[in-house]
Amino acid sequence: MAIRYVFGRAGRGKSYFVLEEIKKRLEGEGHHKLFLLVPEQFTLQAERDLIGKQALKGIMRAEVLSFTRLTHYVFNEVGGITKIPINEIGKNMILRKIADESSKDLSIYKSIAKQEGFITKLNDLICEMKQHDITPIELTMEFNEMEEDTLLKRKLNDIILLYQKFNNYLRDRYVDNEDNVNLLIENIEKVQFLEGAEVWIDGFQSFTPQIFRVIEKLAEKVKNLTITFTMELKSKESDQDLFHINRKTYLKIKSIAQRLGLEEEIIDLDRNERPVLPKVQEICHIEKELYAYPYQQYTGEITHLDVFSGSNLYTEMENVAAQIIHLVRDKGYRWKDIALVSAGLEEYSMILKRVFEEYSIPYFMDEKRSIMNNPIVELILSSIGILARGYQYEDVFRFLKTGFGDLNKDEVEELENYVLQYGIKGKDYAVPFTKGFTNKKHEEIEQEESDEIHEEKIKYNEFRERFIAPFLKFEKKIYRKKKVGHITKALFEFMKDLNIEAKLDQWIEELREKKYFEYVNENTQIWNKVMEILDQLTEILAEESTTLKEYGRILEAGFLACEVGVIPTTIDQVLVGSIERSKSHDIKALFVIGVNDGILPSSREDGGILLDHERESLDKKGLSIGNTLENALLEEQFTIYSALSKPTEYLWISYALADQEGKAQRQSILIDRIKKLFRNLNIQSDVVPTLNRQLHLITTPISTFKYMTESIRQNIDDKPMEDIWWDVYQWYSNESQWDERRNLMVKGLFHENQISYIGEQKARSLYEHPIKSSVSRLERFANCPFSHFVTYGLRPKERKEYQLSNPDIGRLFHDSMENFTKELVNEQIQWKDLTREQSDYFVEKVIDEMVPEFEHGIMLSTHRYQYLVTRLKRISKRAMWTLTEHIKKGQFVPMGHEIIFGLEGDIPPIVIELESGEKIYLEGRIDRVDILNDEDGNYVKIIDYKSGSKEFSLSDVYYGFQIQLLVYLDAVLSSQSQKYQAEVHPGGIFYFKIDDPMVKTTEKAVKEVEKEINKRLKMKGLVLKDVNIIKKIDEDIGRSSSILPASLTKEGEISKTSSALPEEDFKALLKHVRGLVKEIGEEMLKGNVKIEPFKKGGDTSCKYCAYISICQFDHSFHENQYKTIKELKNEEVLEKIRKENENI
């Protein structure tokens, strides 16, 4: 028995040496077995290399194995497995069950144990402990020796509990991979197939203590054992850190060999010149000097190394793709000669796929893919969630949107709209839908029901029945059955009822037809993977009792542990992979992307269950778990060294200056190191696009089209453009298949994103006749004509959701005010006679009556909304009593509430005649009108209730943004003048905020607090500049009013700070507003649909506009500019309006 050590730096041909030896043995006379042991993820490539490189006729005696596969070989011969094997999926599910059951006994991990990812970390830690031969007993002994109540001690307490329970659960029944290795160690000496065998171990940097024991047993059993080490036999002082882990591994193996008394042989490939693949000087220099201190600098010409700096991730990938095309097209490379690796592949993945497809580069992404986002997994977890959480919206539509239910995509979207609008959830699915199909008393609409409503009702209930039918069967099967086995069986039958397997096959066929072979490969495995998980779940937890919620968490833990590997669909393609994981065949060119600070080398996060310093603390006490931060950094350093030394002819290293969100990124220290190693290195970049760089991007028709478009756009914007792009444009012009796309491009380049007018004919066809307009419609047009066009011309409908919006709350306030007034009329109570107790009683009464019917009972649907009802009552009580006190303090009396003016209203509309003779009828609803009839004349006061803050601005009135109160005043003045056959005068126009403000107090008297509240509820607006009228609105005015925005001087005159206007200015304002309405009406009927929002200071009309995604207003377009509004002072407004009247 002998052991051989094969030494050599990266690229010295160690693997080639091993394969060559195996070839010689196969060609020789012997009949003994030959085994090549490699890491699990490299077995496929090693098999290919063994078959392909050696040109052998047969390899029956030689096999490529991982240590896991070796375990299976041993057990197949000697037996020994009397327990049920469980994989990582099964372990995760068991640990989830244990963690949930142990929640009360945990201290540090009580809440953390419920988080996604904890179980995976716990499983990893237990695996490490088993691999390092650390048992719960050893941990307990260490725990007992700890004196201080440290965080580590409390962590160990939880870990010991979970670890022990896990082992107890497995004992006598199950065996995991780590226990299998222990069984392997016990059984190696019994097997016959290893008698006289030769074993080569290649591709490892280090081993766990468990695997060291396996190697020890192999060394005792086999004829020859050969192990390769990527390191120099006598490393230079400068390379000590680089080969530190490899050297430790070698010394450990050597000590085993010496203890066994094996014959040792050293093969040093660094000294023995061998016919390995020659490499270019630049790659050789990197291999020798990357981590050498001191280092030698390369001073020659650099032709086989490029370092590139991209503006962002996308341009970095575009330049990578262009260079790959260059190598294949101009240098004669095959796709398979090229590999691309990254330490941040997740961030690049989607960009890479898109760019490579644009450039028609065939590629294979070597990665394990989580199945968590697969539709079948989504279907299973959402189905369990539906029953566990009682048909909640998220679970129901997570299920339906998988596409494997009995509703098609359009039906799902229709049902979702209905469910969101009426708040369908829980038990609502168990009975026929009636919301939206009943009258206000929730009685079925029968004979009066329209055919359309009846059909809608039938349709939605058919959707409901098709969705819920399989769930009712599922629910019935698990009713009162709590065992995991019963639920799993019912789940399988549920999937069978849905015909999932056949639907999956059909979907895979559709993917195949669309040539999405990558997804075909992935989804072909998914059904078997799911069945494997359900089988494992039944095998290990069948008799365990659980709840549906816990069952879902256990199943999710299993799915989280499951990944699928994808097999390459063809050999000739670019290999894409993680720098840590990928093991490629011999390659000529390597692209290393994402070489940014924190990515390569990575900024290792101490995110495990045990932190690095805690591992070190245990290591000092003899409990070595191995995976310290220092080891991880050394391993990564070795990985970088191995990767950069891999190609034979060309190396590309690149990084991005900004991430996908545009945040700046720094280059890696690795870039600085490469720059130091190569004196003449010139880092290329696309930040300033040179002619050569642009020429480099002219590759394939699809990818080049985009660059051409960007360049011509620059030319249009008066920026410099290289003439080569006109030649490129000419090429596309000569290719007829590009005509449609080229024409669209030209149209897009000269797109102005502006349509001023659609014409009178179209405008008249869009808007109803006669034109009846609300004030808010006119204000919207003044804000932006395009917003008006979309709202009142196109009339899109927003998806209605079962939730209260601010307008809904405002409507509730308004309705309650109206109903309050009706109660007073019914009870024949005058406002001036109303008491506080009566006011509060009527508020309670009207709101209690309104709430059950308001928006389909939404106010009673949740505790949050029920609390809102209480708050609304409090605010309404305060508002009603404040308004009552206002009336009591003055001589104005309410003439009416919710007064409608319009063609069919309580009072006539305002009629505006346009130049064409056509008329616009202004209509609206006035919250409250008060009137004063005395010897001085008739005066009216307009009050509009607002649930939010609303400041009155004469400047906004002037521009047409706030004409509501003046239009209301105009309508009432006109109607009352006709009624009294005499002039009626404006008394005031006001906003009243419905609120119950909180007042900070330091034991103030109740009267003082009330006074402060009334001050805050003071109305805002304009009052007639007449002391007599002001006093008739507020008889208690004194120096300052608590009702309206007015105050008096010592002499009893109206102060300058008062918001008051003489009657002639009121009339001038009314005239100005009528002029605005006419102007807006003229523009509306001309078809003005300009995208022209206003900008006033820092405020714009786009701020709360729902249509910004439709108009796509962008002020970088010359035609998209804000209509800048200057804020005018009150006197400026009045001066302008007076001048208007003078000019008429």
UniProtKB/Swiss-Prot annotation:
Binds 1 [4Fe-4S] cluster. ATP binds at residues 8-15. Disulfide bonds: none annotated. Its cofactor is Mg(2+); [4Fe-4S] cluster. [4Fe-4S] cluster binds at residues 784, 1102, 1105, 1111. Keywords: 4Fe-4S, ATP-binding, DNA damage, DNA repair, DNA-binding, Exonuclease, Helicase, Hydrolase, Iron, Iron-sulfur, Metal-binding, Nuclease, Nucleotide-binding. PROSITE patterns: UVRD_HELICASE_ATP_BIND, UVRD_HELICASE_CTER. Residues 274-584 form the UvrD-like helicase C-terminal domain. InterPro entries: ADDB_N, DNA_helicase_suAddB, DNA_helicase_UvrD-like_C, P-loop_NTPase, PDDEXK-like_dom_sf, PDDEXK_AddAB-type, Restrct_endonuc-II-like. It comes from the Bacteria. GO terms for molecular function: 4 iron, 4 sulfur cluster binding; 5'-3' exonuclease activity; ATP binding; double-stranded DNA binding; helicase activity; metal ion binding. SUPFAM superfamilies: P-loop containing nucleoside triphosphate hydrolases, Restriction endonuclease-like. One of its GO terms (biological process) is double-strand break repair via homologous recombination. Despite having conserved helicase domains, this subunit does not have helicase activity. Heterodimer of AddA and AddB. Belongs to the helicase family. AddB/RexB type 1 subfamily. The heterodimer acts as both an ATP-dependent DNA helicase and an ATP-dependent, dual-direction single-stranded exonuclease. Recognizes the chi site generating a DNA molecule suitable for the initiation of homologous recombination. The AddB subunit has 5' -> 3' nuclease activity but not helicase activity. This is ATP-dependent helicase/deoxyribonuclease subunit B. It comes from Alkaliphilus oremlandii (strain OhILAs) (Clostridium oremlandii (strain OhILAs)). The gene is addB.
